[in-house]
């Protein structure tokens, strides 16, 4: 296929103009610290919470100036101790955490701002096809998948790049054990496949939000996806939530923390997908990302509750507070944990 990026009809991000950024209290973890924080922009007045269409140079997946010119690439990444440290994950714009089989989790990492080498690439699930429909005709990179899942993927609008099919941009890291050693060279994938670039998938970005003044403090986030504990700690020096395991920060191979300014816990109906059974006899799970449900947004060491709504496969997801106003994400990307309804958070 030809090199390049297909022009999108749906325009970039939602963002508000900058005025001020409030100072935030510090929490430090695991000895990690940084004097630098991500770019942020405030909103005009506390009375104004209008979300306006973005100018063309704002990345709708981060809210940061500089519109990516290449295709969006989604990568399935391992989320267990055996797959750590990951490679390249810190360069992702948005990272979804989803339930698979046996209570375990995998990640779907969205790359538009950068095209690093990424490890450990793992297999696709049917849930991914539904989740990624809102991004358009983008690229999905995976190590493989069950036959029935690959047939569904082939029938979808996604451009699949699968290691088991000996497609472009894969190699195995000899320092890591299989199956945790599959690496995708995203620069090669981006150059080889024509696919959609960034589009609005529902994130509204603003460097400040007057609702935070009265919001509940949330220096830590503790929830579950499946049977897997998913935790984060707010680091004010980084101005980000750092993902943790047993209270310790998760670092990538480069030594960078796995961190984003926002953590969204999105409560979704999750059902058994009996069409796929793993080698231990366990069915995989299907996360319903089309529909409606509750959310909790964590940003700036605070938490705000609300709802999500996505009416169809190709529609963006709308996030609103309890009054129906858009939830505002801090520029810099987000984690999205797809949890079962009622999961303590």
PLM-predicted stretches and their roles:
Residues 42-43, 48-94, 101-111, 115-345:
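A surface/extracellular/periplasmic glyco- and lipid-processing/surface-interacting theme
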Residues 2-37:
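Secretory targeting and sorting signals
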